Amino acid sequence: MIQMQTNLDVADNSGAKRVQCIKVLGGSKRRTATVGDVIVVSVKEAAPRGRVKKGDVHRAVIVRTAKDIHRADGSVIRFDGNAAVLINKTSGEPIGTRIFGPVVRELRARNHMKIISLAPEVL
């Protein structure tokens, strides 16, 4: 579960290293987000020559959470940390050209096919 003020690792090569959630999209009273949800983030730590700079505000898709992900078949997936992929606000395409680490199959149901195709492993 991701809420406001949560710090996340960035799982792409956009140049950002750490981001902070500043808004959960999807309703005025919505407080938490999970895998596949879109959030608004602020870049807190960035690489020197990346596409994004520290302080930039972007949208991001959550690809990994430390909170359990329960599936219909009874299996449970959990990761060591929280991670997101920065996306373009208008097109919804990832800003980076590579994805690092595994992503979950639930992204397919949310129509984030580009992230699934770039990921090295889909769990």
Swiss-Prot record:
A Pfam family that the UniProt record links to this protein: Ribosomal_L14
Alphabetical UniProt keywords: Ribonucleoprotein, Ribosomal protein, RNA-binding, rRNA-binding
PROSITE patterns from the UniProt entry: RIBOSOMAL_L14 (PS00049)
Residues making up the signal peptide according to the UniProt record: none
GO cellular component, one term: cytosolic large ribosomal subunit
GO MF annotation list: large ribosomal subunit rRNA binding; structural constituent of ribosome
Listed GO biological process terms: translation
Entry keyword Ribosomal protein: yes
SUPFAM superfamilies named in the record: Ribosomal protein L14
Function according to Swiss-Prot or TrEMBL: Binds to 23S rRNA. Forms part of two intersubunit bridges in the 70S ribosome.
Sequence similarity: Belongs to the universal ribosomal protein uL14 family.
Quaternary structure annotation from Swiss-Prot or TrEMBL: Part of the 50S ribosomal subunit. Forms a cluster with proteins L3 and L19. In the 70S ribosome, L14 and L19 interact and together make contacts with the 16S rRNA in bridges B5 and B8.
Protein known as: Large ribosomal subunit protein uL14
Gene that encodes the chain: rplN
